[in-house]
Regions:
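Actinobacteria-biased recognition of intrinsically disordered, low-complexity terminal regions
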Residues: 1-3, 196
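Generic hydrophobic, amphipathic alpha-helix propensity
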Residues: 7-18, 35, 60-64, 68, ...
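Helix-turn-helix
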Residues: 13, 17-59
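Solvent-exposed, non-membrane alpha-helical residues enriched in polar/charged side chains
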Residues: 19, 73, 90-93, 135, ...
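Short loop-to-helix capping motifs
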Residues: 26, 112-117
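Hydrophobic alpha-helical connector segments
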Residues: 59-62, 73-103, 153-160
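Amphipathic alpha-helical packing segments from all-alpha helical-bundle domains
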Residues: 74, 98-107, 117-143, 158, ...
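Hydrophobic alpha-helical segments that form the core
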Residues: 104, 108-110, 133, 150-173, ...
Length: 196
C-alpha cells in the first residue's frame, strides 16, 4: 500500500527536488518540467501544490532558512558564550554535503532575486534573519561578559554577518573537495577577538 503524504511533506519534497536541480543545473535549468521530473511528479501535480514557478522557488529558499534555523536550535548547550557563538556561526557555513547544497541554493536564489521581484521578499527575509542571528550571537557574547567593554554591538553584528556570508561564498567557490577547516579557524579567531 503506497504511503500517503500530506500537503506540507509534498511541498518539502518538491522544494528538495528544486534544490537538487539548482545545484546540478543552476536556476536557469530549474524549470517546472525539470523539477517535476526530478521529484517523480507530473507537472500538473506540481502546479497543484505550487501554482507558479516563483512560488516554488520562494518556498525552496524559505525551506533553506527553516532548515538552518532548526539545526541551530537543535545545537546542544556549550559551556561558554564564545563556544556557543562559534558553534552557531559554524552551523551556518557549508561545511558538509547537505549544508553545501543548501548554501548553493541560497546563493543562487539570492542572486536570482535581483531579476525576479517575487523572490525579493524571501531573499530580504533571509537576509534580515541572518542579521538578527548575528545580533543574537553578539548579544550572547555580551551577556556572557565575553564582549570587550565599549564594543559597538550593531557594528560587530554587521561584521559577523558579513564574515559568515563571505566565508560561505569562499567555501562554495573552493568546491566540495577542499578542506573547509580553515573557515572554522577564521571564525574562531574573529569571535575570539571580540572577547574582552
Amino acid at each position: 500500500v503506497p504511503r500517503l503524504i500530506d500537503h506540507n511533506e509534498r511541498r518539502e519534497l518538491l522544494a528538495e527536488a528544486t534544490w537538487r536541480v539548482i545545484v546540478r543545473d543552476g536556476v536557469a535549468g530549474a524549470s517546472v518540467r525539470t523539477i517535476a521530473a526530478e521529484a517523480g511528479q507530473s507537472t500538473g501535480s506540481l502546479r497543484h501544490i505550487f501554482p507558479t514557478h516563483a512560488e516554488l522557488l520562494a518556498f525552496a529558499l524559505k525551506l533553506v532558512i527553516e532548515r538552518a534555523t532548526a539545526r541551530v536550535a537543535a545545537l546542544p548547550p556549550r559551556p561558554t558564550a564564545v563556544e556557543t557563538v562559534q558553534e552557531v556561526a559554524a552551523e551556518l557555513l557549508p561545511l558538509d554535503r547537505d549544508r553545501r547544497a543548501e548554501m548553493e541554493v541560497y546563493l543562487a536564489l539570492f542572486t536570482a532575486a535581483n531579476a525576479d521581484p517575487k523572490l525579493r521578499v524571501p531573499r530580504d527575509e533571509a537576509h534580515l534573519r541572518m542579521r538578527e542571528g548575528a545580533r543574537w550571537m553578539i548579544a550572547q557574547l555580551d551577556n556572557g561578559a565575553d564582549l570587550a567593554p565599549g564594543t559597538d554591538r550593531e557594528l560587530e553584528a554587521a561584521r559577523l554577518h558579513a564574515l559568515i556570508d563571505g566565508l560561505a561564498a569562499h567555501l562554495i567557490y573552493e568546491g566540495a573537495a577542499a578542506d573547509p577547516s580553515w573557515a572554522r579557524r577564521v571564525l574562531a579567531r574573529h569571535i575570539g577577538s571580540l572577547a574582552g
